């Protein structure tokens, strides 16, 4: 389940009101960006957010993963993984996890698009050192 607490309106899950989000999740979003996001956001069927995800191939844990974390510092993420928090239970099982911090809100593609693009390119290029992978201004 991605988020079964999102409100269903007229049979779909729309982009919620901004008040639903923690203030940190909205970091970097100007009023103009928020209006543009709302104008272009598409509603999704309820099961997209609330339906169970069934994964069965254990080989997925052998695929290296890069997490570009915009709302949570690496230390907090790794602590949650170590403690078995359900939010990151699947991630904690992955053998090789690289975390790249990109401090901003939930939508880095809108608040820091150039920095996000640079971090993705570095991750795809196989950059394993988080500091080197995030060699962009913060």
Predicted regions: what they are:
Residues 1-22:
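Serine-dependent carboxylesterase/thioesterase catalytic core
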Residues 9-14, 27, 90-96:
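Short amphipathic alpha-helical segments, especially helix-boundary/capping motifs
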Residues 21-22, 37, 91, 125:
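Generic structural signal of hydrophobic/aromatic residues within well-ordered alpha-helices
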Residues 21-25, 104:
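Active-site rim elements
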Residues 24-40:
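A contiguous pocket-lining binding segment that forms or flanks enzyme active sites
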Residues 32, 42-103, 107, 114:
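Conserved serine/cysteine hydrolase catalytic core
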Residues 39-43, 122:
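Residues within well-ordered alpha-helical secondary structure of globular protein domains
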Residues 94-138:
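Catalytic active-site module of serine/aspartate enzymes centered on a nucleophile-bearing elbow/loop
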